[in-house]
Amino acid sequence: MIIKKFKGEIKSIIDLSKTAKEIKIALSEPIDFEPGCFVNLFLDIGNEKVRRAYSISSPSNDRDNITLTIRLSPNGLLTPIFWNKNMTGTHIELMGPLGLNTVDKMKLNKVYLFAFGVGTGVVKSIADHFSKVEKLEKLVIITGSRSEDEILYKEYFNSLAENSDKISVMRVVSKLPEGSNIPRGYIQDHIDGLDFNNSDVYVCGQEKACNDLITKIKSTNPNGCNYFIEGFH
């Protein structure tokens, strides 16, 4: 992958939940990236050029457009703008693609993708890639959310599982009303019985959540398990 600076125009913004949006950006020039990559986004705010890193959530076969899935940080400089102002048509600067935890490094035929919150966006891109890998034997996708309203890309992941008996999807929610049939708690509460031997494990989300999950997986002493951890604050 060649890292470069380029420009983009925000073409559309979709509300995924009260705290998450998907931003589609038309690029000034095509880029090649591996799923799992991120870009740095630069935006002029006042007299300051603000930079933030966002993972790419779109498939890698579209080189002219990318989507970024962003989470509202109420006290942040950049994301509140997308909730308070119509940013469609805004021209931005980007740099990338960047990242170490990318699909070209995941060589095994059994893959686990775990996502907390907005980390579901990059897992969507990675899942799209592996759904097209013929030698894949098993792809397990588990996402974790605070509430049912914050589950992201539900229909997309359901469609993957419906179209392949090699793919399974589970959603775990920490805060649920009584009587809900959705698995309750955290992802690490629902991995008993999974075989992590000879597998690639990708985790994306807030750093503590990622570390807690990896600790639980490592406690099972799997052999030949590779870890790809994308933690953020």
Predicted segment positions?
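Conserved hydrophobic positions within beta-strands
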Residues: 10-13, 56
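A generic structural motif
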Residues: 14-17, 60
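Conserved S-adenosyl-L-methionine
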Residues: 132-138
